[in-house]
């Protein structure tokens, strides 16, 4: 796996699924391929994106700044600086300085990542802030190691939280989660359907599913009534894809 592929993997792991994630992936690919060279326009686009947390925006801004060649005098962006200040906690800043000194001695991506993984997310963000604000310099490879360590920690905590929700025994949470998943699956079906005859069929199925979820939420239904809703939808989607000659078995 190449270095940039690894960086892209880690960074995308902390972005919530949805159309925005697909757009960010496309822009990252362009940046890493040297196609997008207007850093200012890229940062302005990032700043105004909804849904993303300030820290995720800060990390993406840091990655774009490391990768896109820019004029030396280009202003640092406030939204990135604020996200990478470790919540203003002086302890984070102290640890960030210690980490920075260790990173200065590293020359490889993996070496930097290993060193960084033993620090808290706040300290890692502060250390990125030091480098972003030009208070310290490390090689791009080492900076990417720091980015990936931060993303790994964030993804770990997101995974723990997700696992807790998936394994919860609370029937109301499970019921709502199934309805949310069915609704997003229906939305994806509508986006994937083109304008053929079969597409109209897929759109109809998706539309009915969304109406059903809306009705279930409006009148309040038994928590078990949503069981299998998403799976039924996915079966419909796969049947539609088969007729269109597309084989995508990995939706579940």
Swiss-Prot record:
Gene3D superfamilies listed in its UniProt record: 1.10.10.180, 1.20.91.10
Listed GO MF terms: RNA binding; structural constituent of virion
Keywords, in A-Z order: Host nucleus, Membrane, RNA-binding, Viral matrix protein, Virion
Motif extent (Nuclear localization signal): 101-105
Residues annotated as transmembrane: none
Membrane topology category: Peripheral membrane protein
Principal location: virion
InterPro entries with a match to the protein in the record: Flu_matrix_M1 (IPR036039), Flu_matrix_M1_C (IPR013188), Flu_matrix_M1_N (IPR001561), Flu_matrix_M1_N_sub1 (IPR015423), Flu_matrix_M1_N_sub2 (IPR015799), INFV_M1 (IPR037533)
Protein name per Swiss-Prot or TrEMBL: Matrix protein 1
